[in-house]
Amino acid sequence: MFWGYSLSFGTDINGLIGGLDFIGMAGVGMEPHATIATNLPHMVFMIFQCMFAIITPALITGAFAERMRFSAFLIFIVLWCTFVYAPLCHWVWGGGWMFKMGALDFAGGAVVHMSSASAALAAALVIGKRKGWGKRSFLPHNLPM
């Protein structure tokens, strides 16, 4: 929200990433933007896009379950959203090179689902099996408790 929206929907920089126009939500108000979602308030569009930015890393969590410390997972999510999700979002939805080539992504098929599936598969392959898998039975647990 502080920089991701700007990197995704800021002024196009060579089709690769958005500029820092909206960093810290600067210029995001209740008036419609001139080029981004011209039929609804800019703030509403930003919140709608935040929903996708939240759901996408949540889909990856299944690959990390019981394989990574929560603090490491949070660091991964911040880095992944900055260096993977934001550029991909800009490419497809924010006026980047794929958008200019005519790519259409309805309901997040490429930006959300393909990126989270690729990240989850890569993470599962890199991290490997859970510690103790096949050697002992796992005790049930509840993370919030």
Predicted regions and their residues:
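Hydrophobic alpha-helical transmembrane bundles of multi-pass membrane proteins
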Residues: 1-145
